[in-house]
Amino acid sequence: MAAHDDDMNRGIRPGRGSDDPAGQIAYLEQEIAVLRRKLADSPRHTRILEERIVELQTNLAGVSAQNERLANTLREARDQIVALKEEVDRLAQPPAGFGVFLTANEDGTADIFTGGRKLRVNVSPSVELEELRRGQELMLNEALNVVEAMEYESVGDIVTLKEILEDGERALVVGHTDEERVVRLAEPLLDVTIRPGDALLLEPRSGYVYEVVPKSEVEELVLEEVPDIGYEQIGGLGNQIEMIRDAVELPYLYPDLFKEHELRPPKGVLLYGPPGCGKTLIAKAVANSLAKKVAEVTGQATGKSFFLNIKGPELLNKYVGETERQIRLVFQRAREKASEGTPVIVFFDEMESLFRTRGSGVSSDVENTIVPQLLAEIDGVEGLQNVVVIGASNREDMIDPAILRPGRLDVKIKIERPDAEAAKDIFGKYLTERLPLHTEDVGEHGGDRSATVHGMIQTAVEQMYAESEENRFLEVTYANGDKEVLYFKDFNSGAMIENIVGRAKKMAIKDFLEHSQKGLRVSHLLQACVDEFKENEDLPNTTNPDDWARISGKKGERIVYIRTLITGKQGADTGRSIDTVANTGQYL
């Protein structure tokens, strides 16, 4: 077979000689046929090879993607192993403790307090020993050495400062169970002025106090700022203002004259009278005026005085002794301010709520200890210098007589209801030429705005104080059978006048919005008076008319019967009668 193939390759036809032409032709024809078959089969082989190549390329891409996924999975597994190792190492570390810095030593060690023990430990080089402060919190490693400085403690117990000890670094405090304890002052408190009675934050384990905690029980009851109210803003109380200025300002401004005449300055002033007539307003103006007088005497640009406003009802506490303690703190605060030569006004508003007559049986008798506490503060062993006590009340008959006697509340000033002249003065504080006035009203007075305002006030006051049928308010019957008709002028007050002016201004605004007529008119004032009177028709709504009359400022025979005479806002008669309860015990 191999020899046959060699003969074919040499061009020799098998079985014949090399010189046979017919054989050579046949052989060549056969060779041509073979070549033609091979040529015909070559595209099919090419397609097979191309398909194989594509298949191999697809397999290669799949293997590469799978290899990439395996590589990513390996990387993620490695990262997780590293993270888990770090977590295991972190969890295997010993806990870090905390301590409180006490003091630094010359050898570079520090004394700390931790776990109820006082230790001397080393300090990490990363911590500056000189920058550590008393009471500062520290982080400790497992060997209890300092590795990091932290902030000061921010939580703990509340204690009350009793006194600071002589070394200036320790203090005597009282806990909530009245237990006394000596504590250390942390660095933040060494540069702060703290006073006995202040509430401090104590970390009980280390014995450090860190900061002063504002106490709402005292801070909210005491207003130390001087009110920005002057006597010129108070109308209709000229005589009362002069009396209180003589009682409060003269002793402080001219102490030498008082000493020369051997005259003792008054310790207190009682302002009493019906509600809404300016008692609290006068007390606020006293502190402001006193500050200005101090500036004039000392030659300073601004004077300084303190106004301690004690809110009587909020001072009451359900715990025995708490109210007395707060009164002591108030006067202690006043003495501290006054010791600097600054006048201090201690103002008790609604004084009857705290200092009622002892043994009256009309309350829980808590005043049996509250009243003596105030008496001891006013004229006890510790004198009050540059401190004036001012009390305000509309039920002075309920205040304990021991407080009202001379030597305590020496000066008693009655704040009366305003008469017609006083009402004009009060109206003048709220009705000024600066207000927008209606052109028709101004035109009636020849364009003079001052005359217009004066005329409006005159008209309003005349209507308010007229004893006319529409101004009748009450008919009272006394115990002896006499009857009396009371008018609205008998119950007028500065607060009511302010409210009337406010109503009139609101009416002027509504007229401008609805009718584009700008300016205040006298008709607005007159209508405001009518509305104010009618709105007060329910004022005497009480089961005890005698008590109501005392509050309203009506003195005289005991009242047993009240009948309202006012006509309702819709024109219907709303007259009502009110009977007294039996044996009220109140005589006017």
Curated annotation (Swiss-Prot):
**Gene3D superfamilies on file:** 1.10.8.60, 1.20.5.170, Nucleic acid-binding proteins (2.40.50.140), P-loop containing nucleotide triphosphate hydrolases (3.40.50.300)
* SUPFAM superfamilies from the UniProt entry: P-loop containing nucleoside triphosphate hydrolases (SSF52540)
Annotated GO molecular function terms are: ATP binding; ATP hydrolysis activity
Output the Gene Ontology cellular-component terms. proteasome complex
Q: Which UniProt keywords apply?
A: ATP-binding, Chaperone, Coiled coil, Nucleotide-binding, Proteasome
Question: Which SMART domains does UniProt cross-reference here?
Answer: AAA
Give the residue ranges for region: Docks into pockets in the proteasome alpha-ring. Answer: 587-588
Question: What is the role of the protein in this entry?
Answer: ATPase which is responsible for recognizing, binding, unfolding and translocation of pupylated proteins into the bacterial 20S proteasome core particle. May be essential for opening the gate of the 20S proteasome via an interaction with its C-terminus, thereby allowing substrate entry and access to the site of proteolysis. Thus, the C-termini of the proteasomal ATPase may function like a 'key in a lock' to induce gate opening and therefore regulate proteolysis.
Notes on the domains: Consists of three main regions, an N-terminal coiled-coil domain that binds to protein Pup and functions as a docking station, an interdomain involved in ARC hexamerization, and a C-terminal ATPase domain of the AAA type.
Q: What is this protein called?
A: Proteasome-associated ATPase
Which species is listed as the source?
Streptomyces avermitilis (strain ATCC 31267 / DSM 46492 / JCM 5070 / NBRC 14893 / NCIMB 12804 / NRRL 8165 / MA-4680)
Name of the gene this protein is made from: arc
